[in-house]
Structure formats: structure tokens, C-alpha cells
Regions:
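Extended catalytic cores of very large enzyme megasubunits
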Residues: 1-242
Length: 242
């Protein structure tokens, strides 16, 4: 691929794959998975690079960072390419999709705060949703704690209405992420956490009972020391606010 063609497909200038590098050895099925998920595509939707060119793009641009410390970039890139082509080491998915691109986002996991605010705060519910959507477009996944949100049905003084609650906003997030393809290749991975002492914890634990609901999240309960002491003492652990 020439530099002009690379730029057209959102790829930073990358030297050609050295001719003496070996081809990657994969089954045809594995090769098709790599092509389907990770190679860059042109405007027509067809692959704009081979699997070997994709590996070299990743290897070269990861190695290029070490030029700052006087490393021989081409030699280091060759080392990395051999690790990839021999299946000795694979990076995370965002590295395959993001290395050597104009954005260059390589991180797989982000943890975002959610404040009990509809959007005026920098970490308000919908500001965080916006940030998370942008992260997922670059191939990253997100983790959230919904523990600061007030319980469902609580009074909202500013509007004299009732609070939606953590599970309600979890559904809002889930619906939004259902429309976003992570990195243009797959749906985003998300983790929702709620503290065990939140008044809505039982609804939260049961929110995925219907397997057709909240399909873009895994959920986890945040366990506290007080809860574990109550378990050991075989006594009730009251929820916060009750």
C-alpha cells in the first residue's frame, strides 16, 4: 500500500512489509476472523490491507514509539511482527484496530464516574454517556459505578418529579450502546457496578433475568466490609437510606 493510499484509508505512513518476513500461519477460518474484525477497510467496505500488512502496521507503529530512546525501530518492529505472525503474543483488540491510525487509541478499558446529575456536572449521567459513546467508537470498553444515583422513586426537588434510579439509567446506557459498533467492528463491552448497600440492589441483581434485556452490559455487585461482617455474623445488612 502506498503512503497516499494509506492516508486515504486513515492509516499513518507505514513502510512496506519487509520481503523476508514470513507470512502469518493461520487456518482459513482464523484468517477470515482477523480480516472481518481488524483489518482496515476502504470506502467500498472491502479490506484495504492483508493480515500481514495489518500485523506490520501494528508492529511498526508500536515500535516507532521507542525511537525516543534510541531504539532501532525497524529491528524492534520485526521482533514484534514475529511475535504476532507466530501467535506467540497478541495485543488487545484496540491495538489491532487503532495502531498506526490517525486517532491511535490503543486502550481497551476505561472507568468513568457517574454523578447524580442529569448533565450539568462534568460527570453527569448524560455527559458520561456521551464520553462513553466516543470511547466505544475508538474501540474501548467502559466500566461504570451507578452507586451515586439516588434510588428509584426518590423525590427530585428541582422538578418535583421522581428519580429514574440506577436500573432505569442502566437501560438508557444499554440502549445507546446497542447502536454503537465498537471500533467499527463489534459492539462495546461494558460493566455496571452497584454497591450492595444501595436501596435498589435487588432490582439491579435481577435486571438481566430476561436475557433479551440489558444485553450490552455485564453487572457486578460492589461488596462492602460492613456487608461481609454482617454475613459472617448472620445478621441483616440494611441498605443505605433505609
Amino acid at each position: 500500500m502506498t503512503n497516499s493510499t494509506q492516508t486515504k484509508h486513515g492509516i499513518l505512513p507505514t513502510p512496506p512489509v519487509p520481503e523476508d518476513l514470513p507470512s502469518a500461519v493461520f487456518t482459513e477460518n482464523a484468517r477470515q476472523v482477523l480480516i472481518r474484525r481488524y483489518v482496515r477497510r476502504g470506502d467500498d467496505g472491502k479490506p484495504a490491507e492483508t493480515v500481514e500488512e495489518m500485523f506490520w502496521r501494528v508492529a511498526y507503529h508500536i515500535a516507532a514509539v521507542e525511537e525516543t530512546w534510541g531504539t532501532d525501530v525497524m529491528a524492534r518492529a520485526r521482533e514484534f511482527y514475529h511475535l504476532l505472525s507466530s501467535k506467540a503474543f497478541f495485543p488487545n483488540s484496540p491495538t489491532f484496530t487503532g495502531a498506526g491510525t490517525l486517532l491511535g487509541q490503543l486502550a481497551a478499558c476505561f472507568v468513568l464516574p457517574i454523578a447524580d446529575d442529569m448533565g450539568r456536572a462534568s460527570d453527569g449521567i448524560f455527559q458520561t454517556l456521551r464520553d462513553a459513546a466516543l470511547i466505544q467508537q475508538t474501540g474501548g470498553g467502559n466500566g461504570f459505578s451507578f452507586s451515586r444515583l439516588r434510588p428509584k422513586g426518590s423525590l427530585v426537588k428541582s422538578s418535583a418529579g421522581q428519580a429514574t434510579g440506577p436500573v432505569g439509567f442502566l437501560r438508557v446506557y444499554d440502549n445507546a450502546f446497542g447502536e454503537i459498533a465498537q471500533g467499527g467492528t463489534r459492539r462495546g463491552a461494558n460493566m455496571a457496578v452497584l454497591r450492595v448497600d444501595h436501596p435498589d440492589i435487588e432490582d439491579f441483581v435481577a435486571c438481566k433475568t430476561n436475557e433479551n434485556q440489558i444485553t450490552n452490559f455485564n453487572i457486578s455487585v460492589g461488596i462492602t466490609d460492613a456487608f461481609m461482617r454482617a454475613v459472617e455474623a448472620r445478621v441483616s445488612a440494611p441498605a443505605a437510606g433505609k
